[in-house]
């Protein structure tokens, strides 16, 4: 079984804001050091950014308002310098920014199918949504906000879902219509890694960090290689190291970072990566 959330889930909104700030940092310099945490809910967005790259607070606020679709949200933004020891460690060449353990695995047919369904629903209804698929029992659970409760003009959405997904045993909005979003639920960075990474394992979060952070670069690299090889790969690294051990064999961290950079650029940046994670429509 697998659970997927869409880009309007509050946790994904937090991830997307964090990703947008990383994108802003990369516009300022080629190799920024960034670690962003976001907590959002009930008309307030708190952000702490540990970084060596000064961002214009107006750009930060604009990104928050754009992603939340809320021009009145209160933004509490705090930017602090990265720890000097961590910053100095990266001065000569890119090295692992922290200790980490990782496992990349091939995406399963179940994960691909649910992600396809979630993406198609989101194209039709771009509001907060969460979905579960269990192919063993052919069961599909859809919790989609703002689509009616059976007594409104919006019930055509239900009809469309039932027509479109006839081969699944479906439950749609089991307690009726709901409105979702950050006024109903709070969101925080890196709380939906199961949705983002499937059966993969990571010691840290995927979002809100620059590519020197192994939590970003190694997770992306192992995901790509697992798809290529059709099998799982395990890795570990330690802070300050220029190698990552993948299935016991040392690999150059700089090359891993460049492969991850190409992946992020191809997908459209860190904010785009945060929309669906590594398993995307």
Regions inferred by a protein language model and the residue ranges of each:
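A domain-level signal for the structural core that forms small-molecule/cofactor-binding pockets
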Residues: 1-281
């Amino acid at each position: 079984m697998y659970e997927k959330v869409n880009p309007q889930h509050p946790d994904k909104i937090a991830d997307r804001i964090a990703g947008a700030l990383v994108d802003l940092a990369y516009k300022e310099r080629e190799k920024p050091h960034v670690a962003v945490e976001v907590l959002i809910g009930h008309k307030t967005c708190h952000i702490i950014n540990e970084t060596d790259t000064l961002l214009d607070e107006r750009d930060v606020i604009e990104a928050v308002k754009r992603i939340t679709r809320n021009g009145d949200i209160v933004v509490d933004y705090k930017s602090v310098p990265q720890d000097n020891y961590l910053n100095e460690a990266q001065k000569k060449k890119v090295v692992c920014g922290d200790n980490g353990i990782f496992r990349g695995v091939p995406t399963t047919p179940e994960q691909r199918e649910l992600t396809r369904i979630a993406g198609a629903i989101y194209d039709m209804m771009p509001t907060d949504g969460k979905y579960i698929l269990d192919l063993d029992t052919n069961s599909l659970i859809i919790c989609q906000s703002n689509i009616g409760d059976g007594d409104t003009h919006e019930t055509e959405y239900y009809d469309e879902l039932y027509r479109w997904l006839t081969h699944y045993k479906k439950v749609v909005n089991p307690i009726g219509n709901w409105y979702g979003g950050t006024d109903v639920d709070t969101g925080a960075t890196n709380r939906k890694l199961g949705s983002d990474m499937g059966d993969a394992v990571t010691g840290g979060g995927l979002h809100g960090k620059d590519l020197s952070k192994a939590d970003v670069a190694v997770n992306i690299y192992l995901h790509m290689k697992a798809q290529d090889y059709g099998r799982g790969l395990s890795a570990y690294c330690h802070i300050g190291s220029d190698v990552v051990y993948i299935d016991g064999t040392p690999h150059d961290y700089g090359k891993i970072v460049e492969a991850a950079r190409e992946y992020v650029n191809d997908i459209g940046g860190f904010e785009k990566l945060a929309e669906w994670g590594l398993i995307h429509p």
